[in-house]
Amino acid sequence: MFTWSGLYESINLGYDAIKVASYDCASFRFIKEIKKYWDKIFVSTGATYEHEIEKTVNILEGSDYHLLHCVTIYPTKLNQLHLSRMEQLRKYNENIGFSDHTKPYETGLIASKLAIWLGASCIERHFTILDENLTKDGPVSINPHQLNELSEFGGYDKLKQKEIIEDEFPSWQASLGNPDRKLSTEELMNRDYYRGRFASSLENKVVNNWENFAKP
């Protein structure tokens, strides 16, 4: 979900869950409105300060919400993942996932596999049936074969998962990073760019996601 107009257009489409992008984790009025219509809500927490995540968690209390750790660098390198951050997010909720923007054709599925082994309850990946070079997000998208591989990995026990990880990425601990890490300059620049990228035209007004707007 990227805009107010998209929110209202989606209400009657029959979806029982909705996903909020990292750049709207701090769009508090937007999230309040989403909570009115959906109980199951996935929220990425990339490029978001701790006090903003806390406020969003307070808004979502009482719903079936999932927080996704995310690094908003496209593509994300394996040493930029800070996957130990997932454990830090568990102070808010046990439903913690990972939004993965690594390049599968360079680093495989190791980032998602590592997150699953570390206890992620859900994984978000861009998905395509096209060649990786045909779309803007193709380089960070997985194809049906890779999706099947990831699904199979999720069905293995923890011991087998660890064996696979250590075989594919012996230096996996480099991806754990710092649970209290600071947002990087690149993430903050992306926050400024993407937060202002989408707006809605509603009731003859241009409305950004972080602004107060709600249909009566």
Predicted region positions:
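Catalytic cores and adjacent flexible loops of soluble metabolic enzymes
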Residues: M1-P216
